[in-house]
């Protein structure tokens, strides 16, 4: 069985960039991803949504970000295994065995970039929700904005996703109604300002009451007041429930189910590192840009701590390519 320098579990944005950086440092690397398509949430949940907080990219869609990361990754030697679910990670005599539902691979180091785990959307909580979702009346994320062209759309939620999608839907939908059960939104101030100064109809503090055919009824919180308007589609942005899977015995996790990391992004198991939304430490910020830095930090740390059978590369990227 071939022994690699590094196995990365998770092919989201942080995992893809981590693989590129590891290859740039001269590590032999493989990435294992349970989904059939790489790219994580940006690719699979919101490929057309614009992302604004990545350095050097004024705005990029989830699909284009994934495309760019894969093009970057293609510059180095690597192996990408899709559709394989990691079952367990074991360490014996300083070497990790990563077992999936299809095979077992060995490596000196492991980097977990599994994100928030398996995601299930939080739902409205109404009796007919599954039927309405199957009919396409209710959605939890958008894979194609064309589905909403010329439609009357109601967006439920008060965070960044609800705000961002409302702004994007405004460009294609006939009308956009943003419904939040509180008076204040939880998103970035600049995004809230953009929504308030747009043509989006904001309804706060309201919650879902009833839907008959295309007639949506909202109920005002702590009031008998109600509001009715015609609607074609509903987008629910109440966030996601996560199902983090502990892959290694004795791996320390925080209360929120994420892997505890030290200042070098190493877990309590020597040689097993973590980066991105899967990690937790004091002051942790769940941002993609932070995850990229965590991946670099973890790989640089393991190159100093672990023993490799070949010399590693250093220096700036401009001197390597």
Where is each model-derived feature located?
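Glycine-rich FAD pyrophosphate-binding loop
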Residues: 23-44, 176-187
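Rossmann-like NAD(P)H-binding beta-loop-alpha module
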Residues: 36, 149-172
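Conserved N-terminal glycine-rich FAD pyrophosphate-binding loop of Rossmann-like flavoproteins
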Residues: 36-60, 188-192, 196
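FAD-binding core/adjacent interface of flavoenzyme oxidoreductases
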Residues: 1-9, 37, 80-151, 220-224, ...
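N-terminal Rossmann-like FAD-binding beta1-loop-alpha1 element of flavoenzymes
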Residues: 4-30, 165-170
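A Rossmann-like FAD-binding core segment of flavoenzymes
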Residues: 73-100, 104-107, 170-261, 310-318
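A conserved FAD-binding loop/helix module that cradles the flavin
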Residues: 163-165, 278-321
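FAD-site-proximal beta/loop scaffold in flavoenzymes
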Residues: 127-149, 233, 237-289, 297-301
């Amino acid at each position: 069985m071939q022994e690699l320098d590094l196995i990365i579990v998770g092919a989201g944005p942080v995992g893809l960039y981590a693989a590129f950086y590891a290859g740039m440092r001269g590590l032999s690397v493989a990435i294992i991803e349970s989904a059939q398509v790489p790219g994580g949430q940006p690719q699979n949940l919101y490929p057309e949504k614009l992302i604004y907080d990545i350095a050097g990219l004024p705005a990029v869609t989830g699909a284009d970000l994934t495309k760019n990361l894969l093009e970057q990754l293609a510059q180095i030697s690597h192996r990408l295994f899709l559709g394989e679910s990691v079952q367990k990670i074991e360490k014996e005599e300083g070497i990790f065995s990563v077992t999936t539902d299809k095979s077992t691979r060995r490596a000196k180091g492991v980097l977990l970039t599994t994100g928030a785990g398996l995601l299930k959307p939080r739902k409205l909580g109404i009796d007919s929700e599954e039927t309405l979702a199957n009919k396409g009346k209710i959605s939890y994320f958008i894979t194609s904005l064309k589905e909403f062209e010329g439609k009357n759309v109601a967006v439920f939620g008060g965070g960044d996703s609800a705000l961002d999608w409302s702004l994007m839907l405004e460009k294609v939908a006939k009308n956009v109604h943003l419904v939040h059960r509180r008076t204040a939104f939880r998103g970035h101030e600049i995004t809230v300002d953009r929504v308030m100064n747009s043509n989006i109809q904001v309804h706060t503090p309201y919650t879902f009451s009833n839907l008959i055919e295309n007639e949506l009824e909202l109920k005002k919180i702590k009031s008998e007041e109600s509001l009715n308007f015609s609607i074609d589609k509903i987008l629910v942005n109440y966030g996601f429930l996560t199902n983090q899977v502990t892959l290694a015995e004795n791996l320390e996790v925080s209360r929120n189910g994420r892997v505890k990391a030290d200042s070098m992004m190493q877990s309590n198991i020597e040689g097993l590192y973590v980066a991105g939304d899967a990690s937790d430490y004091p002051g942790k910020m769940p941002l993609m840009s932070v995850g990229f830095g965590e991946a670099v930090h973890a790989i640089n740390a393991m190159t100093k701590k672990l023993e490799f059978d070949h010399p590693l590369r250093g220096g700036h990227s401009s001197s390597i390519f």
